[in-house]
């Protein structure tokens, strides 16, 4: 009987710990939403909240027009564990901070360890955004042999023309796979559809109309003078059309 009670207590403790962790992860997601990071979309997996799906859209600099899919893997005891979350790209990405073999992004230069309550996932994504916006600046003050891709770093510093050419190859490849069949059946995997006038046309017009109304004085006053982004998601699926 005593053994049964101890087992139940352990099960209850594990359940409570799991629920608390889920709330913390949900809070991280809410913070990302509130930060409105331009060009980055992420969502936790439906099956496993420790795995997130993401897409990075390059908006400026050498990586403009890139579309890089990535996965975020959170440590089992996130966010209490000091271990860092892992970001892994789904394709080759040439960058001094991206390992050419595992496609993983080295975030240790910005986050030596994870500090619960101080470090957040939105900051991790902001770091991703910044290092792709200006890769050269992202390696200033760091010894070349401490970078994940030494060859990329040396090209960036000494042969920028060749570096740009390789980046363009990455960008071309990324665009060729935008509409690929999802590698998973997880309903939260981010899916993109080719534009279809009969399906997406009406939604696009609603987005345009909404943006037009937000520029009117009355609309801005009703929202405290702040414009908000608009998005529509196909019912039952995660296929967004949005405007920031």
Swiss-Prot record:
Gene: cbx
Family: Belongs to the ubiquitin-conjugating enzyme family. FTS subfamily.
Protein name according to UniProt: Protein crossbronx
PROSITE patterns (alphabetical): UBC_2
InterPro entries: Ub_conjugating_enzyme (IPR050113), UBQ-conjugat_E2_core (IPR000608), UBQ-conjugating_enzyme/RWD (IPR016135)
Residues annotated as transmembrane: none
Annotated ranges, domain UBC core: 20-176
Pfam family membership, one: UQ_con
